[in-house]
Amino acid sequence: MKNDQGFRWSALTFGAAYYPEQWDESLWEEDLRRMQAAGIQVVRVGDFSWSVFEPEEGVFSFRLFDIFMRTAEKTGMKVVFTTPTAAPPAWLTQKYPEVLNHTRTGIPFGHGGRRNYTYNSPRYRELCAIIVERIAQRYGPNPLIIGWQIDNELNCEASEFYSRADEEAFRVFLKRKYKTLNALNDAWGCVCWGQTYSRWEEVELPCITASEAGAGSSAVTGQTSGSSSSLNPHRLLDYYHFVDESCRAFCQMQSDILRRYIRTDAFITTNGTFPHLDNHKMTRNSLDFFSHDTYPGMAFKLDSGKKFPLMDRTWSMYLAQARAVSPHFGISEQQAGASGWNTCMLAPTPKPGQIRLWTMQSVAHGAEFICYFRWRTSCLGTEINWHGILDWDNRDNRRLTEVHETIAQCRLLQEIVGGESLAAVAVAEDYENRFDAETDLLHGMLDDESRQAIFIASQVSHTPADYVWLTDESQPAELFRYRTVFYPHPCIITSKRVEILRCYVEAGGTLVLGAASGCK
């Protein structure tokens, strides 16, 4: 299903992620002027700054960002402001430990990382609503702010949630969906392995199974509860839909607050494609357009055994999937240097020409806002090995020159803004089968192999391909523009989707289905 996109860029726009709270105030004006000299028009700020805005509960401080906004005004720099809810302050998690996510074994996450919270904690939602509203009240009317980003990388790192609040919310979700325990028992096939429930209190979140504990698999981290366990797959599938709904509700809450205070010409977005999240519904209900993070250099990661047969071209697949959510999407984080936390994701610095190549790759797939990550190389914390455009020495360098030249070249491409992809081939996807492939080893293997093979064939034959997400509300006309549609392995398929596919084939389209289609 395609999303209508209300917000449109009038020109290709370039930005950089900037963290004024991490740098001395004396550097700010010079940094913004150097960015502008390179063609950068926008800075993205605010993510992970909750403790700056609210150092103690109910005590708010806007001094740092007030000064920064005055500096931005002085230099003429535009701003994308990010809500800081991805990293709660220490006072919050210490005072209200019920906001913390847990492993499946019941161990609470602690303070010191990020994304350690659960969407379903009433207290966390309450405190998030307060900080988002205070920031929106303060900066929402400011004409320098062209847009707002909600949180940062929803469902990244943690896309499973096991707190008491999550268990209670899961039961509410199931009661709303099934109404009765008999209906749930039938839908989950609970007669298999004697899993029938007689009271709602017996229904729990996905748990550690004997096969997992014996194999010593994911029981320690408590994440990745899919095909590595012997848990009821129908229960897992509903759980993933529950996580999706919880995340989207969290995003919607923030969007509703922002809409009350920000200017009508300012956009709302969020970034990244991460597990157990229906980006189409989230974008349709809460955002003006979807944004993606693109790090093609991770194809060359030094600490990963994963193979990318087409190397950095692999990111064309992810960009095409982002285009399926928003035809004219944004890039919140475009790789500009070597990447790496101190613990993982170590990847080398882009070779000469690769920043230009990767930027053009994003633009070619429909991105109209490109925000490089980051302006300055980090010199503290977990991201200490994550390089930006500038190195630690603060001098002009090869990457800055390449960014400048790339942006100048993109200025010659303005006629493509608002253009439409004209692929003749599409790959059909849906979230039910995406989630199910995590619960079923056979489905997952088939899906991974076929999806990669179709992508490689498309790339080496220079045949552009779109991704089309099907729902029961999709219209057959959405497929008519494609001569061929691949629907790799839709193990789960509804009668309404069968009718959509039948109409497509009867209209002359070629449909390619994979093994196990419709088996569930």
Name what the model sees in each region.
Residues 105-317:
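Polysaccharide-binding and catalytic clefts of secreted carbohydrate-active enzymes
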Residues 200-206, 215-219, 223, 264, ...:
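Carbohydrate-binding surfaces of carbohydrate-active enzymes
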Residues 13-25, 46-65, 110-129, 154-159, ...:
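The substrate-binding groove and active-site-proximal loops of carbohydrate-active enzymes
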Residues 29-38, 42-109, 136, 254-262, ...:
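Aromatic-lined substrate-binding rim segments of carbohydrate-active enzymes
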Residues 16, 35, 43, 72, ...:
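Conserved, mostly hydrophobic/aromatic
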Residues 2-27, 32-42:
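An acidic-aromatic substrate-binding cleft motif
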Residues 9-14, 39-41, 73-79, 141-146, ...:
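Short, well-ordered coil/turn segments that N-cap beta-strands
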Residues 22-37, 128-134, 272-283, 351-359, ...:
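Short, acidic/polar
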